[in-house]
């Protein structure tokens, strides 16, 4: 608890010298936060039939891969306050979206979710460091990713675009390219390393980062087997204007003497209302305390999947999300007119996602596919049953 309190004070810019600890003691305590040796946050369980066999090696793997960018850990656990409603195998019908509680590395789970559909796009943010604590061992990250993305192939069209958000990890004072083996595996299965984008999260996090600059970005890896042109989603600065400034500050007309729009304008680019997005995605990260302001230790802002969804899919198309988390991608799909098919392995986070969706999208009906019952009815029945059993 002392370590977490010091980390919180450092984050808000408090002078830690006033705590009475020496500079060396403070550095050692904050190192525990950076190395992930405080409460909270293992990566998602391995996919996962091999999880039990990997439990012993999992502890060693935990020490090898740490999140060096920010303290995402916290003692908060949604399941600690109330028993989960959702159970493994549940499929929740949320408007025209589907959310299944299960293992995204299990082809049977993916088949139950998709029901023969295939998605045009996959946008996801897998756990990549000590982010979530399932009290079941962290497993092996490569095995997790291989299992999930092997099963995902049955959920995706051959021309699907696949975008994966990952952040940096530091260990032993070095940045660790932990994704290398997984990317090589993806290439061996025919996925091209099509693009590598940067998510600019805004101002860097406060604190001392062992001499590194304050972290303020993550990556988005773009894989595909076939090209798809990005949609033009960004308004052009001079759209609709009849004049344009030259580099020297003088102006030039965008119309000819006959009044017609010229075919070419600024820097020999055609006049247009919209353009394709930049490869640097400028979206502020979520801020707040886990359990008070946010309900998931690695929640990403709705604007991030919205950005990708609008760039690489059209209204009415299907988006696949194998790491459903707290429902961010599903919310983005509803707001943009896409159809989401999401998997989440942890029942407590399925409940968190449903509650968040009910708050942000109150018009959507939420029913259990197996019975057609609404979520509240299922919750009442299952919690009553749990009390009787107790």
What are these regions (language model features)?
Residues 29-32, 370, 382:
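Non-catalytic, charged low-complexity extensions flanking SF2 helicase motor domains
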Residues 18, 264, 363-366, 370:
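Generic detector of low-complexity/intrinsically disordered segments
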Residues 1-351, 390:
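Core catalytic lobe of class I
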Residues 59, 127, 367, 376-379:
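Serine/proline-rich low-complexity intrinsically disordered segments, especially terminal tails, linkers
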Residues 104-107, 370-374:
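Conserved SAM/SAH-binding loop
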Residues 92-95, 354-368:
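Short, conserved SAM-binding/catalytic segment
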């Amino acid at each position: 608890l002392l370590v977490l309190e010091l980390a919180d004070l450092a984050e808000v810019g408090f002078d830690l010298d006033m705590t009475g600890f020496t500079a060396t003691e403070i550095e050692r305590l904050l190192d525990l936060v950076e190395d992930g040796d405080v409460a909270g946050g293992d990566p998602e369980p391995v996919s996962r039939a091999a999880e039990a066999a990997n439990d012993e090696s999992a502890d060693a793997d935990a020490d090898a891969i740490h999140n060096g960018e920010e303290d995402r850990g916290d003692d908060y656990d949604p399941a600690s306050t109330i028993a989960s409603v959702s159970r493994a195998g549940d499929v929740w019908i949320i408007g025209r979206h589907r959310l299944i509680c299960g293992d995204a590395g299990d082809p049977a789970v993916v088949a139950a979710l998709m029901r023969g559909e295939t998605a045009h796009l996959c946008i996801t943010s897998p756990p990549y460091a000590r982010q979530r604590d399932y009290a079941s061992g962290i497993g092996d990250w490569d095995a997790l990713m291989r299992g999930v993305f092997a099963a995902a192939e049955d959920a995706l069209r051959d021309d699907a675009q696949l975008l994966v958000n990952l952040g940096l990890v530091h260990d032993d004072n070095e940045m660790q390219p932990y994704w290398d083996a997984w990317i090589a595996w993806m290439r061996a299965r025919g996925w091209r390393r099509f693009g590598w984008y940067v998510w600019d999260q805004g101002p860097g996090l406060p604190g001392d980062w062992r001499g590194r600059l304050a972290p303020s970005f993550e990556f988005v890896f773009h894989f595909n087997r076939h090209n798809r042109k990005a949609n033009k989603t960004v308004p052009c600065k001079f759209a609709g204007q009849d004049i344009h400034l030259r580099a020297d500050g003088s102006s030039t007309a965008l119309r000819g003497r006959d009044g017609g729009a010229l075919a070419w304008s600024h820097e020999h680019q055609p006049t247009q209302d919209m353009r394709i997005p930049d490869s640097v995605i400028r979206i502020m990260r979520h801020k707040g305390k886990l359990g008070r302001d946010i309900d998931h230790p690695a929640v990403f802002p709705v604007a991030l999947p919205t950005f990708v969804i609008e760039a690489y899919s059209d209204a009415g198309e299907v988006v696949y999300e194998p790491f459903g988390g707290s429902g961010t991608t599903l919310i983005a799909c509803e707001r943009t007119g896409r159809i989401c098919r999401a998997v989440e392995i942890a029942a407590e986070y399925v409940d968190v996602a449903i509650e968040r969706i009910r708050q942000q999208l109150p018009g959507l009906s939420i029913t259990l596919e197996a019975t057609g019952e609404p979520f509240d009815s299922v919750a009442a029945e299952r919690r009553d049953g749990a009390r009787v059993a107790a």
